[in-house]
Amino acid sequence: MKTIVLGPPGTGKTTTLLNEVDKYLKNTDPNRIGYFSFTQKAAYEARDRAVEKFNLTEDDLPYFRTLHSLAFRTLGIKKENVMQKKHYEDLGKKINIRLDYHEYDNEYSGIFSTNSDILRIIQLAKLRSITPERQYNLKEHTQDVSLRDLLIVSNEIEAYKKEYNLIDFTDMITQFVLSDASPKFDVVFIDE
């Protein structure tokens, strides 16, 4: 059964979902319940509320987290193996194309933040499982971007990641899905 709870912030969506978690906890091992949120802050808030409400420990609820956190932990990824701002800056200097990139947000949600349409196009293409050229041809970007520069940057990012054994947040999710390493759940809650 699929239930969708909609509403703006502060309207009780998380409380409603935790009430549903309560129903499942009566007959379901907490290790078989996944509760995923977009931000680490929201995932921890839900976990902490569940710990208090259901008299559990944090360890009892290992799958109250973000999807990126689940992938990171399950695959045994180290932070130094994930593309950071310094890597984009280094690559930009090497190819003489400014790669304006901001760190992933402080909530560790995997939100990619940049003012660069080149990087945005590449990221959207990866998320949609299409080529950067196809994403470019959709004309969803706002700045003047040359297809030539886009393809150079896309190829150079992949080469850089390979050379330095790095992945980005999208790679993390892709590798997780392909690994078939996901825990088996009886029920999953998505608090987005």
Question: What are the language-model segments listed below?
Answer:
Residues 26, 55, 76, 92, ...:
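Short, flexible coil/linker elements and helix-boundary hinge sites characteristic
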Residues 57-61, 66, 85-94, 144-158, ...:
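SF2 helicase/translocase NTPase motor core
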Residues 192:
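Catalytic glutamate of the conserved HExxH
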Residues 49, 53, 70-74, 90-100, ...:
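Residues that form generic nucleotide/phosphate-binding pockets
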Residues 81-109:
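Conserved phosphoryl-transfer catalytic core
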Residues 1-80:
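P-loop NTPase Walker
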Residues 2-5, 16, 32, 103-189:
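Accessory N-terminal region flanking or inserted into the helicase ATPase core
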